[in-house]
Amino acid sequence: MAIKVGMVSLGCAKNQVDGEMLMANLKNAGFELCDDAALADVAIVNTCGFIDSAKQESIDEILELATLKKEGRIKKIVVTGCLAERYREEIHKELPEVDGVFGIGANADIAACIESAMNDFTESFPEKSKMPLCGERELSTPSYFAYIKIAEGCDNKCTYCAIPMIRGGYRSRTMESIEKEARGLVENGAKELILIAQDTTRYGIDLYGEYSLAKLMRRLCKIDGLKWLRVLYCYPDALTDELLETMAEEEKIVKYIDLPLQHASARVLKRMNRTGDRESLTALMKKIREKIPGVTLRTTLITGFPGETEEEFTELAEFVKDIEFERLGCFAYSQEEGTPAALMPDPIDDEVKNHRAEIIMESQMNIMDRLGEKQVGGDITVLTEGFDRYAECWFGRSAMDAPDIDGKVFFSAETKPYYGEMVTVHVDEAIDGDLFGTRA
């Protein structure tokens, strides 16, 4: 009788893709896949280890499954992903309920690892480079959109970030493998493809000797049936004119740039091992908007980095007000063991860090309210994602919104749309970052 396996995948979309490949490997090896890990023989926790809150979420999930194991509802618990890669010894020592701990390099041999864990505690930590860059996936997203991971690892070495330690150096996939996967996804119903990596803008530098994201995107735009092509996790240093021109010219590429800037103070950015200052970043945002009219700019910021003064925080807050990003996320700095920033002097009190993040987000909500009002009275294209039974209306995303991190468009419709259908919605109202309207 086949062993039933179920997965809980935590963290970012990149980790989600890893989990999808892992589950496909298990299916091909004869395991029975279970949608609910609580109903499986083996529960896999695909963990995130990026910041403290993500680590805690991973630990909480393991402990919740441990309760089910104690009750006899599941037989084994195995842990994979970033937390497993980074804290292998601690997991074994502090969480005795866990039957297997596997690093990211073990994904290719996950079937053998789990079979071993059925008999005795097992751990496997091959070289990170052994993690396959591509492969068959058991998709966890709806059929109408999918992520494509175009590279693994990171070479940027930001002082606050543990990803290079966890994931290793930057490794790009070939254009041919990405195009093949993209065509398969579109043939199976995907209307939107979302390119992801730790740093998408450096795609190809290791394979082709030059930044090749623009060439890749032009190639993907030729796929019949693809409606939207979106790219996340761009890095400001590598945002080339060729890429901006490609985004402006290609109709299938949504006019949306996710550009995590982290800060605007030159001193803070230098301590983060990032380049730029308020003036240069302001100029870059202006350039993007000039080259791509109507673009949606999304960024991510960090408050409370060690040594951040009131003046430097004020500079960041003023920068946010001046630029008026269409989408923005802000997080209090989380100290990561083993990173240079963890050893820096002048740490900021948690209460101060969190308060500064709240100030930024409050300011951003005011900006989004004003920008949302400008949408009222107009028509937008919406990718239908579901029906809200409480509000008795449909909802979906516009080209201005990426899954999970951005807002929604809620709309009424006399003609029932199907999931994944692209419909035109007349915007009647904007509230708290979401739009409300009627199918045109």
What does each of the following model-derived ranges do?
Residues M1-Y203, E242, I253, I257, ...:
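Proteins enriched for Cys/Gly/acidic motifs involved in redox and nucleic-acid/cofactor modification
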Residues V5, V42-A43, A146, L193, ...:
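Conserved beta-strand core positions
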Residues C12, G204-G225, R271-M272, Q335-N366:
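Radical SAM enzyme [4Fe-4S]-AdoMet core and its adjacent flexible, acidic
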Residues I77-G81, R86, E187-E311, D322:
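Conserved SAM/AdoMet-binding glycine-rich loop
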Residues I178, L195, V231, L259, ...:
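Conserved, mostly hydrophobic/aromatic
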Residues A197, Y233, L261-H263, T299-T303, ...:
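Active-site proximal loops enriched in glycine and acidic residues that flank catalytic Cys/His/Asp
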Residues K255-Y256, L269-K270, L281, P293-T296, ...:
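Extended hydrophobic-aromatic, low-complexity segments
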Residues L343-A440:
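Terminal RNA-binding accessory module
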